[in-house]
Design a protein with these regions (language model features):
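A contiguous, low-structure linker/loop signature
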Residues: 78-121
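A short mid-domain helix/strand-loop element embedded in enzyme catalytic domains
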Residues: 123-141, 145-155, 184-190, 194-197, ...
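Phosphate/oxyanion-binding active-site loops and adjacent basic polyanion-contact surfaces
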Residues: 11-18, 43-47, 119-130, 151-152
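Amphipathic alpha-helical interaction surfaces in cytosolic regulatory modules
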Residues: 7-90
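Conserved ATP-binding N-box helix of the HATPase_c
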Residues: 46, 52-55, 146-182
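Helix-loop-beta hinge of the Bergerat
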Residues: 105-143, 208-218
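Short beta-strand/loop segment at the start of cytosolic alpha/beta domains
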Residues: 1-5
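Conserved beta-strand-loop-beta-strand hairpin that lines the nucleotide-binding pocket
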Residues: 72-82, 87, 164-218
Length: 218
């Protein structure tokens, strides 16, 4: 039996808990999962890498690859292509719907298309790729001191390094700049990193569990 998981129409950090709850219930019910994104109207980098992490978790359960229906709105579908989502998604999902040909955008508001992070070398490549373009936007458009942009690169590096050190599997990162009219009415840069790995506790337990004994926990 196929279990349906609706992808929120507005898929970002605010709607992710709703999506995660639906995913959890569907997994508990058993059967093949169908992620339905046909009605998607917008997705932040958080939503895109979160959907990939859900597909990764579904594959880890075993059985057939989860299904994914693509957005039907041409503009939304085009953005997902430009953001590099489908290049990663095709390794996890059986995709239903026509995906237009195209490559991730080289110069646009997508500072870093969805990019796989599996090893330390990937982290260095990600930071090197994005640093110059990010600096131009952070200092030129957001008015941040150029020296302070180093903190942006460090935050990106640390977030990606957590995948390498604590996930026990691969993950993804995406970075985008856009005008956030609804909440801030200004231009923002969003970093999103996700994986469906074992997490901090399980990754540290072999060394820290014995050290702290009964005091070891979340």
């Amino acid at each position: 039996m196929t279990r349906l998981v609706d992808v929120p129409a507005q898929f970002d950090d605010r709607s992710f808990d709703q999506f995660a709850g639906a995913f959890s219930h569907a997994v508990a019910d058993g059967g093949r999962l169908l992620f339905d994104a046909h009605a998607a109207e917008w997705a932040s980098p958080y939503g895109l890498v979160g959907l990939l992490a859900a597909g990764q978790a579904a594959r880890a359960v075993g059985g057939d690859a989860p299904l994914l229906t693509v957005p039907t709105t041409p503009e939304v579908l085009s953005y997902w292509v430009r953001a590099g989502f489908f290049l990663a998604a095709k390794e996890l999902f059986e995709i239903h719907g026509r995906v237009p040909r195209g490559k991730p955008a080289a110069d646009s508001d997508v500072l870093l298309p969805v990019t796989a992070v599996r090893a330390a070398e990937d982290v260095h490549e990600v930071v090197g790729h994005i640093q110059q373009r990010a600096t131009a936007i952070l200092s030129g458009e957001l008015g941040i001191d150029p020296k302070a942009t180093m903190g942006f690169a460090m935050a990106l590096s640390e977030a990606c390094q957590n995948i390498v050190e604590h996930a026990g599997t691969g993950g993804w990162v995406a970075v985008q700049s856009y005008h956030w009219r609804r909440r801030l009415a200004r231009r923002v840069v969003v970093i999103a990193v996700a994986d469906a790995g074992v997490g901090f506790r399980a990754s540290l337990e072999p060394t820290q569990g014995k050290r702290f004994g009964d005091r070891w926990g979340d």
